[in-house]
Amino acid sequence: MSRATLYRMFPGGRDALLEAYKVHELDEFFERLGAGIRTIDSFEELLIAVVVGATRDLRSDHHLAVMLAAEPGSTIESLTVESLPRIIAMATSFVAPLAERFVDRDTARAATDLLTRLTLSYFLAPSPVVDLGDEDSARAFLLPFFSAFVNPPTHV
């Protein structure tokens, strides 16, 4: 079946089909991510597990790889300009309540926002220095950020 035929079969056409697919994939992504993080017992370990798990999941997503290869510009745009607010909102609604076991609500939301942006940025433009898919590398890179959230500097 051709793409055009598929688009015609889906009410709303191509854009509606792609939007439904994005929502489905985000739901699946957070379900996979949640499997291993609900029992973690510290703020730092929770956020490291989220970043490492998200990075690994993004890297192993076959459909995302195909989309990036076939239409890199529109795929990157859909992960940044178009969908970033929704991705951050979904990440916040999923991760922040788990982080609130360790820190206040505002800190949990700010940390989730920052780490979502970092994770997507490092996925789309990998660093030769930091590998957020590697637990040790992610921990070494992220711990200074966490200490700033948990122990904010006092201003005189």
Feature annotation, model-predicted:
Residues 89-101, 113, 118, 124-156:
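C-terminal peripheral helix-coil segments that are non-catalytic and often amphipathic
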Residues 55-84, 92:
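Amphipathic alpha-helical segments used for helix-helix packing
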Residues 20, 33-59, 112:
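Hydrophobic alpha-helical connector segments
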Residues 36-40, 68-72, 123-130:
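Secondary-structure edge/capping motif, primarily at the C-terminal ends of alpha-helices
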